[in-house]
Amino acid sequence: CKSYEESLKYVSAEKYISFGGLLEYYGFDENERIGIAEKYSLELKQDYDVAALATNTQLKTIYDNLCEEIKQKSKEQDELLLQYLLQNKMFGKVGIVDIGWKGSMQYYLETYLESHNMDVSLMGFYVGILPNKTLHGETHGFLYDTNDHELRKKVLCFAGGLERLFQSLEGSTYGYRKEFGKIVPVLNAYEYAGSPEIQKCISKLQDGALDFVKENANCSIDDKKLAYKLVQFGVSPSLKDVRLFSPFYNTDGTCLLYTSPSPRD
């Protein structure tokens, strides 16, 4: 990156990002993040408005001070990712599966593959997809896509709940490293590691979803009709439905509960 402003172009589209999240974005591991936060007397959990990052002079100063280290980490990860894709024989037509929404993952992967002259044609399969950038590969949304986005608003009303159906029970990938001659993903700390109740809920949700898929695998009913009850559950939940998600919280920045606890809770 030639500047601080340019370095921010791949930051997540979330409204807020924590200082720790920004340092992770720049490639610093947990111990490094703690050290940097202490050096600059900042809290790792302190949130920043993503839209205002480019004009934050304090963060720009920190970036300028760490710039060379960030560039070195970026080069190392770029090479490791390339080796990882080659190691896993990523050539020709490749399908990717994600929950979807704006198509950012497919866009950035396409950009990376093109920059390294890799002959790969991506096809994305999503719950719902309406890209906000031009994609070269194909996309298919089971509930909505560019050809039919009637259900988009209703689906996004329940985005947090739907994302739990795809929630891994391990940390997300934030880098790669070489281990015993192979390139392996480096996983972040699992966001619900200290919440066994939530882990149990996620497992039950996913088991139920898989059972539903198995039962309806050969069903001729349209995808949107099959998902009708799930969509309605998200748009017009009963109080009982809402309480199913009372233990859940959002970890993008400050911890926020999915639902407001009632006085008796």
Kindly label every feature range from the protein language model.
Residues 222-227, 240, 244:
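Compositionally biased intrinsically disordered low-complexity regions
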Residues 258-265:
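Conserved small/polar residues in nucleotide/adenosyl-binding loops
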Residues 1-217, 237-254:
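Positively charged, amphipathic N-terminal segments that serve as targeting/anchoring signals
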Residues 227-234:
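Amphipathic alpha-helical surface "interface" segments used
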